[in-house]
Every structure is written in C-alpha cells, then in structure tokens.
C-alpha cells in the first residue's frame, strides 16, 4: 500500500487500507471486472446460467425481490419460506461484478434449498445439512462471475479479452477466497 499511495510504510494510515477488517480482498490486480457487467441484465444472466446446467430458477426469480428501492435492506440473502419449495432471494442488484457474483451466490443457496425441499421428506430434513454445505454450493457458483471462461460462455466477453484478463482474474479470485477463509475462521471459532 505504501508503494501504491507513494508514502513511506511508517506513514500508512487506516484510510490507506481498502478494508481494515479484512473481509474483502483489496484491489491489487489490474482488472476492472465491473466494466464487463455495466450494460448486462444480471437477472437474465443468472437465469440463463442456471438453465444451462439444468436448473430452472424462473419461479424463484419471479418471487424474489431483486432491485433496490428506498429504505430497503441493503444486504442480500436467500430464504426458504415454507420448506415446500417457496424459495426467494432478496438482493439490490445494479449491473456490476459484485452483484453478478451475489446473484450467482444467492441463487446457489436457492437451488440447494430447492434440492432439499422434497415433498416426501419430513420437515426436519428440509434444511441445509450444515451452513458449510449451503455456503460451499453458493461459493462455487459465485466464483463464475470472476472466471473469464464463464464470461465467454455467457457472451459477456470474447476469447481475446478472456486471455488478456485471465491471470488478473485468477489472482483476484484467489485473494478473495483466501481472505474469505480467514474471515470464516474468525466467525466460526
């Protein structure tokens, strides 16, 4: 950070750090993923992606609250309303890499919930096996927003652009996951 801001290490102050609590990765690599999503319909990309892997989320998408409005909770979450298949997502999407990854993440929870909301199961079994299992599924899908190969498949960028940003995307994603692992260990200990 000292090099980035042109100050001596001894002169670094808290405001020089992007996230003092180390919950988000600092922007260290030369890729602006946000520019690739600025003119995209994240709702459609999310629906198309899950359809491409055989998961129909159109009913969940229609029942969800996805766009910002005044006084709305700014967080994002997925909730299984009744254990009978009424699964909804709450987001505040605007076209950005952050919200693309969030949509993939939250609908990852939703498809996981869709899988355990089988009508033949007793209600006591209609829930996540553990927080780690539902988070793992959600994080696997979330990662796609940062993967150039996925972005090509979804028509967001072309192969040439994918090759140009591949290393920076890999390093960005790796750093995000390392910091997430650190944060999770603090929260769950």
Q: Where are the language model's segments positioned?
A:
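An active-site-proximal "capping" alpha-helix that borders the catalytic cofactor pocket
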Residues: 131-146
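Short, glycine/acidic-rich hinge or "gate" loops at secondary-structure transitions
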Residues: 3-14, 59-63, 119-126, 150-161
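Active-site-adjacent bridging/hinge elements
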Residues: 17-22, 74-86, 107-118, 155-163
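Long, amphipathic alpha-helical stalk/connector segments used for oligomerization, subunit docking
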Residues: 145-189
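Alpha-helix capping and helix-loop boundary segments enriched in small/acidic/polar residues
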Residues: 37, 91-98, 124-133, 173-177
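Secondary-structure transition/capping motifs at alpha-helix termini
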Residues: 51-58, 96, 110, 114-122, ...
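Active-site recognition of the HExxH zinc-binding catalytic motif
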Residues: 95-116, 135-139
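Contiguous, non-catalytic segments that form substrate-binding/exosite surfaces or channel walls
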Residues: 1-97
């Amino acid at each position: 950070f000292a090099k980035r801001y042109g100050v001596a290490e001894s002169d670094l102050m808290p405001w020089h750090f992007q996230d003092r609590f180390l919950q988000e990765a600092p922007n260290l690599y030369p890729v602006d993923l946000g520019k690739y999503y600025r003119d995209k319909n994240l709702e459609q990309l999310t629906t198309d992606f899950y359809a491409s892997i055989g998961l129909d989320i159109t009913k969940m998408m229609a029942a969800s609250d996805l766009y910002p409005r005044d006084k709305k909770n700014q967080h994002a979450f997925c909730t299984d309303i009744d254990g009978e298949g009424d699964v909804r997502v709450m987001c505040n999407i605007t076209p950005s890499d952050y919200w693309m990854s969030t949509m993939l993440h939250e609908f990852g929870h939703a498809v996981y919930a869709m899988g355990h909301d089988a009508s033949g199961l007793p209600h006591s079994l209609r829930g996540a096996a553990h927080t780690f299992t539902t988070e793992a599924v959600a994080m696997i899908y979330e990662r796609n927003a940062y993967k150039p190969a996925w972005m090509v498949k979804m028509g967001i960028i072309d192969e040439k652009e994918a090759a140009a940003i591949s290393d920076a995307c890999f390093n960005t994603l790796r750093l995000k996951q390392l910091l997430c692992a650190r944060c999770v260990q603090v929260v769950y200990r």
